């Protein structure tokens, strides 16, 4: 039985528009990418391409069918469809982005990956960049400059990032560190 991946994989970008590299460095130590076609749970064991354990300290995987990373690489996994953001996902997405942000701030090399390395990984990478002080559209533009102009083509994600993410991130960070965000509290 073949699995219908329409909800999970980009259908609006042609193959020649996809990035040539599996991952790209967005800022020093912060990488965004996809998953090799043979590095999925339903591939034959001899065909697997594991994330190189020497390259990354930790990985955020947003594609449920990606194989786990190799030995010695810390990983957090949260597979979501490449479709829309709902209220139930926002807290979890912020938690995951914060996990990656904290590790990146500590000097670890962090990879955020999904299937094609365009939308879901772009969403989490954008949240990390917003947590670091970038304005949402600046985060989107930086990702498109460093990864591919077709990154974050999911308009639902871009709309949420540009209209709501900044306030969501501010509230989230304030709940984690009230004295840093609001010194009078």
Regions found by a protein language model. Give the residues of each.
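Short, basic/low-complexity N-terminal boundary segments at the transition from targeting/disordered tails
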Residues: 1-10
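Cysteine-based protein phosphatase catalytic domain of the PTP/DSP
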Residues: 9-110, 127-164, 169
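Short cysteine clusters
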Residues: 114
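Conserved G/P- and acidic residue-centered "switch" motifs that form tight phosphate/ATP-binding loops
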Residues: 117
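Hydrolases whose catalytic domains are alpha/beta-hydrolase-1, hotdog thioesterase
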Residues: 120, 124-128
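C-terminal domain-closing interface element
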Residues: 167-185
């Amino acid at each position: 039985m073949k699995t219908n991946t329409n909800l999970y994989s980009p259908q609006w970008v042609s193959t020649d528009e996809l990035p040539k590299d599996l991952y790209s460095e967005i800022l020093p130590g912060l990488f965004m990418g996809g998953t090799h076609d043979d590095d999925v749970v339903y591939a034959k064991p001899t065909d697997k391409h594991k994330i190189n354990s020497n390259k990354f300290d930790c990985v955020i995987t947003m594609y449920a069918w990606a194989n786990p990373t190799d030995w010695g690489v810390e990983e957090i996994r949260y597979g979501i469809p490449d479709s829309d953001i709902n209220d139930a996902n926002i807290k979890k997405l912020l938690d995951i982005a914060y996990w990656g942000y904290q590790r990146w701030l500590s000097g670890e090399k962090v990879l955020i990956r999904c299937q094609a390395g365009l939308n879901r990984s772009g969403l989490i990478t954008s949240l990390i960049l917003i947590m670091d002080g970038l304005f949402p559209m600046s985060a989107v533009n930086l990702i498109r400059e460093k990864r591919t102009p077709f990154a974050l083509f999911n308009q639902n994600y871009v709309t949420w990032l540009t209209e709501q993410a900044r306030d969501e991130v501010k509230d989230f960070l304030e709940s984690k560190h009230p004295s840093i965000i609001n010194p009078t509290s």
